[in-house]
């Protein structure tokens, strides 16, 4: 609700914008600010699960008229809410990357291959890699993440930012896990074995049904 006497320069903050209209439910968007000022939005074609769709705004969010051209074929098989983050590097001359992630939870009685899928862009979202999957039923460690990753936070070591990012996700029993992303010398993604993040507070975590945790740097 727009407060009374709102200054004209701030009125746009209270405008409602329809990003997309399609048959059925659309929701759970996530967005990232592009270096040229554009806003790239991802959302599923369905309630939580469904083909990953995209829209781009070039006017500060007032309208969304573009979308990613020729998206990866694997995006059609997404099974969870997509999340997107910017990765900035300081330990190498690697340019920024964008990473989009979508989990593979168990939906009712539907079978799931588990794990989460990652797609990368090295050109500010113009082109993207096909999904690469981690912690699926074919791997030594299997998880069925819900909202992977609800948070992806760059880490520090000895007071300096390093090229590592801590991701969080949860499963149906409301256990929240952390896993750390890094890249090999040849640019391949590496994720550490997920570990329970709030094990010392499991009673609280379970009772409160803690989920979709966001980590904010203070």
Feature annotation, model-predicted:
Residues 1-218:
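Asp-box/BNR beta-propeller blade signature and adjacent active/binding-site loops
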């Amino acid at each position: 609700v727009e407060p009374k006497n709102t200054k004209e320069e701030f009125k746009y903050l209270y405008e409602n914008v329809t990003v997309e209209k399609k048959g059925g439910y659309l929701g759970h968007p996530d967005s990232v600010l592009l270096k040229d000022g554009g806003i790239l939005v991802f959302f599923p074609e369905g309630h939580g699960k469904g083909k990953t769709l995209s829209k781009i705004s070039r006017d500060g969010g007032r309208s969304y008229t573009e979308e990613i051209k020729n998206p990866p074929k694997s995006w059609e098989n997404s099974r969870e809410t997509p999340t997107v983050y910017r990765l900035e590097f300081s330990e190498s001359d690697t340019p920024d990357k964008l990473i989009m992630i979508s989990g593979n939870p168990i939906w009712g009685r539907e079978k799931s291959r588990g794990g989460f899928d990652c797609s990368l862009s090295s050109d500010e979202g113009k082109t993207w890699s096909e999904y690469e999957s981690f912690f699926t039923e074919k791997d030594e460690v299997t998880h069925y993440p819900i909202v992977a990753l609800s948070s992806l936070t760059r880490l520090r070591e000895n007071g300096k930012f390093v090229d590592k990012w801590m991701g969080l996700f949860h499963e149906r029993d409301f256990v929240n896990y952390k896993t750390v992303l890094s890249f090999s010398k040849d640019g391949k993604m590496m994720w550490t074995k997920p570990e329970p993040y709030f094990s010392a507070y499991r009673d609280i975590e379970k009772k409160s049904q803690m989920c979709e945790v966001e980590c904010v740097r203070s």
